[in-house]
Regions:
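Helix-biased detector of long, well-ordered alpha-helical tracts
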Residues: 1-184
């Protein structure tokens, strides 16, 4: 099932396997947007310890688009899927007069062990990979809490560069500006 805040859905395939999928959309003029949608949907699965195996693609073009735009998107899609070992199971493309810019929707799919089965394999010392904003926040917390210890294992320039990643966080003053910007 899928909760409103989750990025992926799953369905029990058997007592020990779950079929899991995640979707992402991207819109704009650059054909490379397909790459980011694939990375997002496949990355959401990877963050749930699911090996993505395939993607399904739906593309909606403005009527003014030409065949070359589809070819460019397909070239980039093929490259990123080959690079990540993903099969392309379906590509559906169409144009509509109400579409102002290209919209690409990617659904990535994978199969994982049922969480009860998977938990049996977790042992002390297993590494955890944090991605996205959670990974950024977690990295910054580690640096703040264990900087002295980290300095014994990493170069000072690496520690300083990592600390500068704080600039990528959404800060309180930015959050407070959002209601003001929404009014204008």
């Amino acid at each position: 099932g899928k909760a409103a805040w989750e990025e992926s859905s799953s369905e029990l395939v058997s007592d020990d396997k779950d079929f899991v999928w995640s979707s992402a959309s991207a819109s704009g003029k650059a054909p490379a947007q397909v790459k980011y949608a694939v990375i997002k949907s496949a990355g959401d699965l990877a963050a749930k310890r699911v090996r993505p195996t395939a993607v399904s693609v739906q593309i909606l073009f403005p009527e003014s688009s030409d065949e070359q735009e589809l070819k460019n998107i397909m070239r980039i899609l093929t490259e990123i899927c080959e690079e990540t070992g993903l099969a392309i199971t379906c590509v559906q493309a169409e144009s509509a007069e109400y579409v102002l810019q290209t919209v690409i929707h990617i659904t990535a799919v994978g199969v994982k062990e049922n969480s009860k089965q998977q938990m049996k394999k977790w042992v002390s010392g297993t590494e955890i990979i944090l991605c996205g904003y959670t990974g950024l926040e977690g990295t910054l917390r580690l640096v703040e809490e264990a900087e002295a210890d980290l300095r014994t294992r990493f170069t000072p320039s690496f520690i300083e560069k990592t600390k500068r990643c704080k600039e990528s966080l959404i800060l309180p003053k930015q959050i407070l500006k959002l209601p003001e910007e929404a009014k204008s």
